[in-house]
Amino acid sequence: MSAILSADDLNDFISPGVACIKPVESLPQKQSNENPYEVTTEDKVQPENPPPAQISLTDCLACSGCVTSAEAVLISLQSHNEVLNTLDAQPEIRLVSGENGTVIEDSGRTRDEGRIFVASVSPQVRASLAATYGVSEKEANHIIHQFLSGPNGLRAGGKHGSGFSWVVDTNSLREAVLVLTADEVSESLTGSSAPKRPILSSACPGWICYAEKTHPFILPHLSRLKSPQALTGTFLKTVISKKLGVPASRIWHLSIMPCFDKKLEASREELTDAAWNRLSSGEPNTPVRDVDCVITSRELLSLASSRGISLPNLPRKSLPQSLRLPFPDPALNVFLFSEKSFSRQTSASGTSGGYLHNVLLSFQARNPGSEIVTQRGRNADVVDYTLMSPEGEPILKAARYYGFRNIQNLVRKLKPARVSRLPGAKVATGQTAGGRRQPISRNGASAGSSMDYAYVEVMACPGGCTNGGGQIRIGDAREFNAQHDASVTSETSKPLPHEQRSWLARVDEAYYSADSDMDDAVEDVRTVSVTDNEDRVHKTLQHWSAITDIPLEKLAYTTYREVESDVGKPSAPNDTSRVVELAGKIGGGW
């Protein structure tokens, strides 16, 4: 297990439940038939040494004994060691540029001998790296590309000298999620489709685990869209598999994310090729994950350290054109690696992807003259938004809830009112639901009621994704500075709260400065209207669906399910068979 996983590094960490329903089966040793009867003394009986218990990520997702992800206990194999072992286990399928910008397989390797390695990186990871090394977000991006794909990075060592053929920015697929989110909210307002209002964002896996295990009444409200990480995995595996004729099992996708919960998301049974590959259902093989491995920002440092590579000493410039492979499909290559910026990472959009902000901008574009009114809640992690018409009437209400303390308040507001068992009792509705009276707003809805929202952006970490549990901490940055600057003394004391807040502000600054780091030749986002950007994304998604011959419903959407607890229930006669079935599912044995 990675040594950097600990409860001290997590925000709003809820420790694992005392009752774990994952049974540890201890079978007696098989006795030899040569001597069925033997007389011996007690002191000569050798004590049994049971093997260490192992719990897979899939087992964790099937358990409701823990509230969130229990990162410090269960996430062991999705680490930098798994990346190194995979790179050394099988050679890389070498790819070269062909005619018309396509990519063909090098004749020196056969498809059965190796794998195609691809990686995706979130903007929060780049911001964390930029703050640590004192570089710009753009330079941090170049460092990551040089490390994963360049000749001085991973390719400089290892058994096969393998590296990653493509390194994709998750912002590209985040654009698709943003546009589809606005569509989903619009459809929910007309009552034409699920989910129920208010729609709750589903990109945070810590929040999803919490809802599935403790509050199943929340599930009808969850957005059905995949997260940018999951959508990127589906995108890469479907297109590469279709265009190059390589099975999904030969494509290995590494995702670098700001939090440990993303490891759990990658282990979800719903996020495999079984959801989109029509052939996989008839094949006896285990379904293939869309995201094979997830590491965090700090684990990226451990990965470089394991190979003896100093990240800040790598070239802070883009890879030469000769080392950059075009994506197999020209249209999708432009979408993934476009030099034009179509969205801006501003403080108004937040540090978690800007789902809520984009919904507001989309509806504002449909209502000329409207204005976005912001009202802060009890703390900085709760913000209410109202889109007001020129006449002062509310068009759309939305909110942002970050951190489990605030999430619990949101859940209480959404919880259905208890039905009284007394004969003749009135059912609590509207303003009296929950046993408390609420003031009435001008449009007739109870003021402050979350049921009045059309959309709520929910994230488990206070401050958003730049404050994820896997981000580089101020202590790590101090250690790095002490190693590379003799004038800086290493501090062993735990950082004070104000120092931690200052460090988070530094990471946020790097995150928001991503647009200012871009070249002057890059098109300003203000020249691209919201409507034009939505049309561009819709055309790209239609093209993706057409070339893969897979409906967009299977590519971009997912499902959720209630996780029932077995704690305190009597053991059923077939418990053993149930455990065997559970362990045999996708990811079993991890």
Curated annotation (Swiss-Prot):
GO molecular function, one term: 4 iron, 4 sulfur cluster binding
Family label: Belongs to the NARF family.
GO CC terms, sorted: cytosolic [4Fe-4S] assembly targeting complex
Organism: Emericella nidulans (strain FGSC A4 / ATCC 38163 / CBS 112.46 / NRRL 194 / M139) (Aspergillus nidulans)
UniProt: [4Fe-4S] cluster 2 binding residues: 204, 259, 461, 465
Entry binding sites for [4Fe-4S] cluster 1: 20, 60, 63, 66
Biological role stated in the UniProt entry: Component of the cytosolic Fe/S protein assembly machinery. Required for maturation of extramitochondrial Fe/S proteins. May play a role in the transfer of pre-assembled Fe/S clusters to target apoproteins.
InterPro entries (alphabetical): Cytosolic_Fe-S_CAF, Fe_hydrogenase, Fe_hydrogenase_lsu_C
Chain segments carrying region Disordered: 25-50, 423-446
Protein's name in the database: Cytosolic Fe-S cluster assembly factor nar1
Gene behind this protein: nar1
SUPFAM superfamilies: Fe-only hydrogenase
Keywords tagged on the record: 4Fe-4S, Iron, Iron-sulfur, Metal-binding
GO terms classed as biological process: iron-sulfur cluster assembly
Pfam families: Fe_hyd_lg_C
